[in-house]
Amino acid sequence: MSAPDEGRRDPPKPKGKTLGSFFGSLPGFSSARNLVANAHSSARARPAADPTGAPAAEAAQPQAQVAAHPEQTAPWTEKELQPSEKMVSGAKDLVCSKMSRAKDAVSSGVASVVDVAKGVVQGGLDTTRSALTGTKEVVSSGVTGAMDMAKGAVQGGLDTSKAVLTGTKDTVSTGLTGAVNVAKGTVQAGVDTTKTVLTGTKDTVTTGVMGAVNLAKGTVQTGVETSKAVLTGTKDAVSTGLTGAVNVARGSIQTGVDTSKTVLTGTKDTVCSGVTGAMNVAKGTIQTGVDTSKTVLTGTKDTVCSGVTGAMNVAKGTIQTGVDTSKTVLTGTKDTVCSGVTGAMNVAKGTIQTGVDTTKTVLTGTKNTVCSGVTGAVNLAKEAIQGGLDTTKSMVMGTKDTMSTGLTGAANVAKGAMQTGLNTTQNIATGTKDTVCSGVTGAMNLARGTIQTGVDTTKIVLTGTKDTVCSGVTGAANVAKGAVQGGLDTTKSVLTGTKDAVSTGLTGAVNVAKGTVQTGVDTTKTVLTGTKDTVCSGVTSAVNVAKGAVQGGLDTTKSVVIGTKDTMSTGLTGAANVAKGAVQTGVDTAKTVLTGTKDTVTTGLVGAVNVAKGTVQTGMDTTKTVLTGTKDTIYSGVTSAVNVAKGAVQTGLKTTQNIATGTKNTFGSGVTSAVNVAKGAAQTGVDTAKTVLTGTKDTVTTGLMGAVNVAKGTVQTSVDTTKTVLTGTKDTVCSGVTGAANVAKGAIQGGLDTTKSVLTGTKDAVSTGLTGAVKLAKGTVQTGMDTTKTVLTGTKDAVCSGVTGAANVAKGAVQMGVDTAKTVLTGTKDTVCSGVTGAANVAKGAVQTGLKTTQNIATGTKNTLGSGVTGAAKVAKGAVQGGLDTTKSVLTGTKDAVSTGLTGAVNLAKGTVQTGVDTSKTVLTGTKDTVCSGVTGAVNVAKGTVQTGVDTAKTVLSGAKDAVTTGVTGAVNVAKGTVQTGVDASKAVLMGTKDTVFSGVTGAMSMAKGAVQGGLDTTKTVLTGTKDAVSAGLMGSGNVATGATHTGLSTFQNWLPSTPATSWGGLTSSRTTDNGGEQTALSPQEAPFSGISTPPDVLSVGPEPAWEAAATTKGLATDVATFTQGAAPGREDTGLLATTHGPEEAPRLAMLQNELEGLGDIFHPMNAEEQAQLAASQPGPKVLSAEQGSYFVRLGDLGPSFRQRAFEHAVSHLQHGQFQARDTLAQLQDCFRLIEKAQQAPEGQPRLDQGSGASAEDAAVQEERDAGVLSRVCGLLRQLHTAYSGLVSSLQGLPAELQQPVGRARHSLCELYGIVASAGSVEELPAERLVQSREGVHQAWQGLEQLLEGLQHNPPLSWLVGPFALPAGGQ
């Protein structure tokens, strides 16, 4: 090759630390430039000698210049063919912008993605279904939820709504809050009025009754007729009533007290305006038939109670059976304010809370929680749970900073039937901190029993929330190996471990083990444990029950608080430790127990009860609330979380169910909940609403809050009104009912008539609707709920105006026959929902068949905005969501999401889930800072039937980030089952969106091995991995294997491989000579890029390099080497767009390979035949792209025979964007080198002469060139941003830390763009800032290159590789 060519190929690098050296030092820049210069050096030389070409002198001139002035001339000679280079970049930009429609996409329609496996999915949806996965900052005006279900039928025939929210932080609920831990027994069956238990609160203020009772191996509190309050270990407590503490061993104690008895032990500087006492009882029968009031306060410090507060530890006996009015238990709360009832209950090996007529509240370990409703969380395992709830049940788990205006809760249920036949609402929340509840708050852990069957009114459980405010109902329930919450008549709330919680309702936490607990409570029961600085205006208590029956048939109120410090009580305060005996049987009016609370303020009842191996609180008529560990949570609705395993879950909810898990900073105006269900049927026939919220922090609830952990028993069957349990709350304010109950190995809360809420571990969550999360395993759960159920889990800073929850369901039937709405929200952070939010994980069962109104599922969304419906569903090996009548939304893992509708996410596995839901179901999981104005949800379903016959709308949203949706958004991953057949209204699925704006309906659904979305009547939308996307209408894409998909979908298909590079169709090559005499390859295409017309600008203006354009015309089935093949001869023979190549190019290609050796291996994309073979192999769940026609698949889901080629295919697309970025950076380097020269040139000389050899030019021309260079730099920076966006679309599914370099690179780019764009001329450029900013771009690109190189050597199995073309007819 000639010396001039040599000089062109290898221009000398500038000496010294000049600006140009920043880009020059980058690896691969020179090769990116030289690749083009090289390929066309002979193309430049040959026309010079061509007889029909330019004169020989003209041809010789540039070569002479190169020889004479290599340093000067190299830049422009290199860039002489920039038009053709731009040609390639432009074509690639077009492609990249198509490829990355998951990000920066604008749609006027509805977008959705579906992965389906081994089943029929969504045949006959009448309106729209939206699913959104992994969204951040999503706004939904519809329904949002996420549900994990396993091995059972889930949510068939729910009549109204169920919401589940888990892990919310900073949640606001207007409902009830509570958390209950129940183990191996039946708990809270038939309590007639209210029972509140509060344990270990610190700095608690209670306006009701406070006390805490530890019971072991006996029967406790059966048939108390008036009121009993027990508070233990209080310090600096203020009581306006009775104060006392009793230590009893091996005998019968206080049987038949007619008026009032108060026992207080070891209190220091205590003031009680009510009744305060603490009782330690062992091996005997205790407090049977107290007619008026009994108060026990132990170890509380600076506690103020205006209601009833108490905490009870019960083991191996029957406890508190037949309480007619109310019982409140609050444990270990700190700085909690409750205006209602607060308590937390741990129950094991027994039946728990069966037939509670009114309300029961349990709050545990909440911190700075404010509840205006009811909050609780329930963990259920290996039994039937919550079958036949008549009104509402809400569950929330682990939410942080969540705001809910509806219901919020999260429930963990295992191996049992759960929440069958709840009539009104149940809320469960666990682990909230700083929770504010205006309703009822509690958390309950249930195991191996039947749980919450037939709740008529409300049940709320909230656990571990922090700074939670609830205006609705909030709770989280962990239930294992038992039936839970069957037939509660009114409300039950459980809240556990809240800190700084404020409750205006009932607050309490109950730990129950190996016995029957709280069966038939007539009015309200509240349990709160370990709250600190809690203020309760209602009832707060926490109960630990073990190996006995507890609190069966309380007629009026009972409150128990243990270990409160600085407690003030205006009502009854006390704490009782009971072992090996029967305790407090037949309390007619109110019993309050408060233990170890510090600086707690309660306006209702506060207490916590630990019950083991007995029957607990059977037949409560009024309310029970359980709240656990909430922190700074605010709810305006209902929040709860339920973990259910091995049972049937939430079948027959009539109104709404919301499930949300792990949301953070969530705002919801609808319903939010999350349900984890495993190996059982869950939530069948719930009549009204159930809310469960778990692990919320800084949650505000205006509804119901609670969390319930239930194991190996039946829990809370036929509670008539509400039960609230709050445990370990700190600085909690509850205006409703708050409590937390841990229940194991028993039946729990069967037959609640009104509401149950469970909230667990929420932080700073605000819910205006229903919020909760439910984990169900190996049992039947929540059958026949009539109104609403809400479950919220792990949300942080979530605001819900509707219902929010998340449900994990395994090995059972879940949520069959929901009539109204079910919402599931999981793991949301800073989420705002105006609708319904929830998340459910369901496995091995049929899921959500026959929902009549709406179900929303959202998973893993972050900072998502949705004005429509958003959700994501993962479904495997089962039929899912058949016959939903209205809408279903699933949202998972959203962050900073705002929902005005319903939000939830559902993971279903090996069971039937949510069959026959009449109204709406919403599931939201793992959302963070999500805003939804519509419906948002995500559903993971495995081995079961899912969502068949949805009548109205189903929305699924997963993992969306910064998405805004005005329509319906959701994402569903379905495997090996039938999914969403006959949805009447709408279902939307959206996955992995970030910063997405939707004005229509958006969703993403991953389905595998089944028929998907056949016969959608209106719209189905699936959107995956979109970031900063705006949709005004409907956008849909279906991805299906082994079945029919998207039948009758009236949307549009648009995908990049099929789009021709029409922009470049009319390119022509022309040669002109400008006044300087240099040759320039000009083409008409400059104008679209810069609008500059002077020939020297060609070096920085023009279409993409021809090798890329050629590749685009070939349909993107080429790699870099092929690009070069197509490009080099094109420049010789037929112009910019030629794609032919001949054997004479081999040496040049070999040389180019040498140039590219520094780039690593060059990979080839899969050709059409290979992609067809891949599609025929039915790879694991497909994730549809933002536009129809292609899909992505997790690398780990591909078979071994395809994995390597699919990896190479994905890397080829990454390299495609990488080379585009390198080429653009190389051009930027040249532009900055010119700017450098201009800034250094002496006056009177042409600055931007570009080596043209021209003499001085006048000022006007100089200014024009200045502007041309600046606009050229801006254009290149925009191109680079587009290239980065293309890289983003190829990096889906990677861990967050691996995606950070892309964000840093784009951020540095925007900074540099701002500096250049704000300068009017070259002189105005700030040299120092320019150097720093370019250095930042340089470093960010190096980090990006390292990431891409590491990805080639060590690709994670979670990487979504693609895009692959869908086979014809595979939509």
Swiss-Prot record:
What is the designated name of this protein? Perilipin-4
Q: Under what conditions is it induced?
A: Up-regulated during adipocyte differentiation.
Q: Name one GO cellular component term.
A: lipid droplet
Q: Where is the composition biased (Low complexity)?
A: 44-72
Disordered: annotated segments: 1-22, 37-86, 1060-1093, 1240-1260
**Can you name the source organism?**
Homo sapiens
* Keyword terms: Cell membrane, Cytoplasm, Lipid droplet, Membrane, Phosphoprotein, Repeat
What the entry lists under PANTHER family is as follows: PERILIPIN 4, PERILIPIN-4
Spell out the Polar residues composition-biased ranges: 1060-1083
Q: What does this protein do?
A: May play a role in triacylglycerol packaging into adipocytes. May function as a coat protein involved in the biogenesis of lipid droplets.
Location(s), subcellular: Cell membrane; Cytoplasm; Lipid droplet
Pfam families from the xrefs?
Answer: Perilipin (PF03036)
Q: Which family does the UniProt entry place this protein in?
A: Belongs to the perilipin family.
Which domain of life does the protein's organism represent?
Eukaryota
Q: Where are the sequence repeats?
A: 109-141, 142-174, 175-207, 208-240, 241-273, 274-306, 307-339, 340-372, 373-405, 406-438, 439-471, 472-504, 505-537, 538-570, 571-603, 604-636, 637-669, 670-702, 703-735, 736-768, 769-801, 802-834, 835-867, 868-900, 901-933, 934-966, 967-999
Give all Phosphoserine modified positions: 25, 31
Q: Which disease is it linked to?
A: Myopathy with rimmed ubiquitin-positive autophagic vacuolation, autosomal dominant: An autosomal dominant, slowly progressive myopathy characterized by skeletal muscle weakness variably affecting the distal or proximal lower limbs. Some patients may also have upper limb involvement or neck muscle weakness. Skeletal muscle biopsy shows distinctive myopathic features including rimmed ubiquitin-positive autophagic vacuolation and abnormal subsarcolemmal protein aggregation.
Q: Where is this region: 27 X 33 AA approximate tandem repeat?
A: 109-999
Q: Where is the composition biased (Basic and acidic residues)?
A: 1-13
